[in-house]
Amino acid sequence: MKPLKIIFAGTPDFAAQHLQALLNSHHQVIAVYTQPDKPAGRGKKLQASPVKQLAEQYNIPVYQPKSLRKEEAQAQFAQLQADVMVVVAYGLILPKAVLEMPRLGCLNVHGSILPRWRGAAPIQRAIWAGDKQTGVTIMQMDEGLDTGDMLHKVYCDITAEETSASLYHKLATLAPPALIDVLDELESGKFIAEKQEDSKSNYAEKLSKEEAKLDWSLSAAQLERNIRAFNPAPVAFLTVPVNEAEERIKVYRAEVLPHQNSAAGTVLAFDKKGLRIATAEGVLNIQQLQPSGKKPMSVQDFLNGRADWFVLGQVLN
């Protein structure tokens, strides 16, 4: 089969793993598009994206336009004369003119089984919603947000202990081989394009820091999923009044216990087994915490020197 000339567009590590798979294949990556370098770290030095760093190792031309809407950027893109563009977590909107330039269109790798979760945070929203299964969809891009025709789906289970970090790793392992399969057969017609059912779609909005605050009016099961969905970022948290200030404590692990008849947010117990807090339904037993400026730790370690932070019967906000 004839190698395809590919433009790759992506930014984070998840995208870099797909670029590596393309570089290991018989296809030819002729150019890479990625977000402009951004200030990072304490010194706020400009840092290249993982995709740019990888492309430079292979001496592949890198383009970093702030937008692809301008004529100059589009003319530059057209001159590359790619067979196909592959987009993985790029972060820029592609206008119709760009989508139509490659001979075989633009493919996108999306971290859910479409149309279930469209949008920026499908991995996190799937865990928070309690989905038992997810996967990746490789689709032909159109002007909509994750609305294009689907070419290939690969499924995986979401376990009861799954965090966004572990699921992200699973999908980053599953998706690149599936992408290569689609590219290998793109001209043969093996993968039949399937339309999405809009009525079955949900919008996976980016996680906000406001949502990360544990809301005791939800059930313990919902809060436990929240904790896993928000790990590794932005990390779920609770607040507790300490010396007339409000301490924010990050929460990394918890379990659901049967209900006790107490108001939501009531501190029921705290010992080496955990910090038990009443919710709208069931009890959340928090097992791993992180006070400000410290590393994540067990509740037993947390209570050493901080046992007075909680009072039995107090109701947390």
Swiss-Prot record:
<comment type="similarity">
    <text>Belongs to the Fmt family.</text>
</comment>
<dbReference type="InterPro" id="IPR002376">
    <property type="entry name" value="Formyl_transf_N"/>
</dbReference>
<dbReference type="Pfam" id="PF02911">
    <property type="entry name" value="Formyl_trans_C"/>
</dbReference>
<dbReference type="InterPro" id="IPR005794">
    <property type="entry name" value="Fmt"/>
</dbReference>
<feature type="binding site">
    <location>
        <begin position="112"/>
        <end position="115"/>
    </location>
    <ligand>
        <name>(6S)-5,6,7,8-tetrahydrofolate</name>
    </ligand>
</feature>
<dbReference type="InterPro" id="IPR041711">
    <property type="entry name" value="Met-tRNA-FMT_N"/>
</dbReference>
<keyword id="KW-0808">Transferase</keyword>
<dbReference type="InterPro" id="IPR005793">
    <property type="entry name" value="Formyl_trans_C"/>
</dbReference>
<dbReference type="InterPro" id="IPR011034">
    <property type="entry name" value="Formyl_transferase-like_C_sf"/>
</dbReference>
<keyword id="KW-0648">Protein biosynthesis</keyword>
<dbReference type="GO" id="GO:0004479">
    <property type="term" value="F:methionyl-tRNA formyltransferase activity"/>
</dbReference>
<dbReference type="InterPro" id="IPR037022">
    <property type="entry name" value="Formyl_trans_C_sf"/>
</dbReference>
<dbReference type="InterPro" id="IPR001555">
    <property type="entry name" value="GART_AS"/>
</dbReference>
<dbReference type="InterPro" id="IPR044135">
    <property type="entry name" value="Met-tRNA-FMT_C"/>
</dbReference>
<protein>
    <recommendedName>
        <fullName>Methionyl-tRNA formyltransferase</fullName>
        <ecNumber>2.1.2.9</ecNumber>
    </recommendedName>
</protein>
<dbReference type="InterPro" id="IPR036477">
    <property type="entry name" value="Formyl_transf_N_sf"/>
</dbReference>
<dbReference type="Pfam" id="PF00551">
    <property type="entry name" value="Formyl_trans_N"/>
</dbReference>
<dbReference type="GO" id="GO:0005829">
    <property type="term" value="C:cytosol"/>
</dbReference>
<comment type="function">
    <text>Attaches a formyl group to the free amino group of methionyl-tRNA(fMet). The formyl group appears to play a dual role in the initiator identity of N-formylmethionyl-tRNA by promoting its recognition by IF2 and preventing the misappropriation of this tRNA by the elongation apparatus.</text>
</comment>
